[in-house]
From Swiss-Prot:
It comes from the Bacteria. InterPro entries: Ribosomal_uS19 (IPR002222), Ribosomal_uS19_bac-type (IPR005732), Ribosomal_uS19_CS (IPR020934), Ribosomal_uS19_SF (IPR023575). One of its GO terms (cellular component) is cytoplasm. This is Small ribosomal subunit protein uS19. One of its GO terms (biological process) is ribosomal small subunit assembly. Protein S19 forms a complex with S13 that binds strongly to the 16S ribosomal RNA. The keyword Zinc-finger does not apply. Disulfide bonds: none annotated. Belongs to the universal ribosomal protein uS19 family. GO terms for molecular function: rRNA binding; structural constituent of ribosome. Keywords: Ribonucleoprotein, Ribosomal protein, RNA-binding, rRNA-binding.
Length: 92
């Protein structure tokens, strides 16, 4: 369910300050964040944000198609290793 329009998009203040500082200085170094719940804003376009997935920080380069989505959508938390092989079929 989407967030109410009267509330507006959510972004953590500490992340917003980091983004504004990086845009102001023109720094291209990745911004490390644990805030997966923050919405991607238009002023983040062109920045690389390292989003934590529970184990490591995944670098996410923000493009214009990502605006309005959450940062956590681009840093998967689960790794799929496939289903277990059938032991009977393997034996023959």
């Amino acid at each position: 369910m989407p967030r109410s329009l009267k509330k507006g998009p959510f972004i953590d203040l500490h992340l917003l300050k980091k983004v504004e500082k990086a845009v102001e200085s023109g720094d291209k170094k990745p911004l490390r964040t644990w805030s997966r719940r923050s919405t991607i804003f238009p002023n983040m376009i062109g920045l690389t944000i390292a989003v934590h997935n529970g184990r490591q920080h995944v670098p996410v380069f923000v493009s214009d198609e990502m605006v309005g989505h959450k940062l956590g959508e681009f840093a998967p938390t689960r790794t799929y290793r496939g289903h277990a092989a059938d032991k009977k079929a393997k034996k023959k």
